[in-house]
Amino acid sequence: MDQKTVKKNRLMFPLGTVGRDMMYQLFTNYLYAFVLLTRQLDKAQLATIAAIMVAARVFDALNDPLMGNIIDRTRTKWGKFKPWLVIGILTTSLVIYAAFNTKLQGWPFVIFFGVIYFLYSITYTMHDISYWGMIPSLSTDAAERNLLTSRTNLFAGFGGALANFLIPMLTVGAMTIGRSSVTAYGVIALIIAVITPLFLCFTIFGVRENRAYEKEPAPKISFKKIIRTIVGNDQLRWIIPIFLLQQIGNGVVLGGLGQFYIYFQFGYAGGLYSLFNTIGMLATAVLMILYPMISAKVQRKALMKKLLLASIIGYVVMLAAGLFGSSLGMIAFWIITLGFMIANVGQYGFYLILMISILNTVEYNEYTTGSRDDAIIASIRPFVTKLGGALIVVITTVTYLLFNVTDTTNQISDYEMKAQKAQQVVVEGMALKQSGDEKLATVLKEIKEQELGVFVTDISEDDLKAVVVKNDEAKLNEVLDKVDKAKLTNIDDVLSKVESGQTVGLLLTMVILSFVFMLLTYVLYMKHYKLDEPEYDRICKELEERKAQA
């Protein structure tokens, strides 16, 4: 592959994933929050939703490797990856929009959630496996692959960071779009569903891969081949559970526990969680930029020791500030955020190392079996990520039930939904085909019958009349702002009654579990993964010699 194409791929391939990671963050990290903040669910319904997530991931155990095999077998004039990028991203966009734009409640919502979640598992897999499966076909050079992988993760991190900064800020608190979490999530889902395919166009139209695979006959699809590839590759067998442990440890904080810990401890302000998220992830951006230079000087296993130490320091800081910093007020928030940032240096460094370790098993597979099976092996990363996400949901749900988090979130969702209804009653009152006094009487009757009075206590009848009778737009915004203010005041009152044991429980769970899973990852990797830099270079050199002799 000529140098001009290599340089173009370095830009076009990473650009394609910016929107994909915004989509992933919305569905993975905020779907649960959307459910808790906009739906009234009892414990049975919440447990069922968690079970659906786990069941969908078990389904992915078959779907991901099978999809990888289907991609391996695809032969078109556009290659084997790009057709699935197009099909997958368009269908996922439709699913994402539907997921966050439903008015269903209770068991009907749970059923709808199950259908949507399984559809997402299928459609996201199509473009995720085909996207990451392209990397081995773009380069076999270790340095170039490290550069491409780290740069792709940098762009992915940018998309994820942008989503993690904007979504909480625009869905919770004073800056909520439409003054309603229900409305805000729907609008954000629409925006992401539109821009994600546009970003992926950079990859679809701008990337050129090595299509040497087209000279070989398309492999047959069989579960036997999938299982044989996984079971027959001892390094892949070990890296799967190692990567799973890392994904769980890395995702516990951002999987929901961190979000509600911030709300319970520091207030119902999405902007605070946006800062926690963004600043906490800031160090990972620096690491993504520097990783190619670091990896050229420090071997992976030596680097992991330093990364583990960084995370230990970060988690100790988080615990100290959370347990002993109650008198510090918002200073404690900034210390916890700083600790999270330090811990993420280690966690994300582990992630980069394990990403490369998975990809390097492609050449190992070719070395030991004669077959690369790159799409099947590439499917392992998204499968393990999804499985880890499902287990995080289990951990999160059990924690929520254990510390009675849903008792609080149900009260919050009740205020969110009723405030939206109060705003709707006022706006729709303006369009009523009645006389002025009749319109006002109808609006007041609706407010009383639907028990929305708590949101209009600070609104005079004259102001309400100016809106529904005179259609005063300026007064309308003033009235809607007062409804929103009443909602936030009542939610703050709910949060003031949260017991300290609940917030401490969330803190201890997310910090201790994150560290334990990271430590297990480190121990197993050091003991069982043998494809370090010298060994990988030796394997690649021998493969080149075999091809030269063939």
Feature map (PLM): residue ranges:
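Membrane-embedded alpha-helical bundles of multi-pass transporters/translocases
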Residues: 1-550
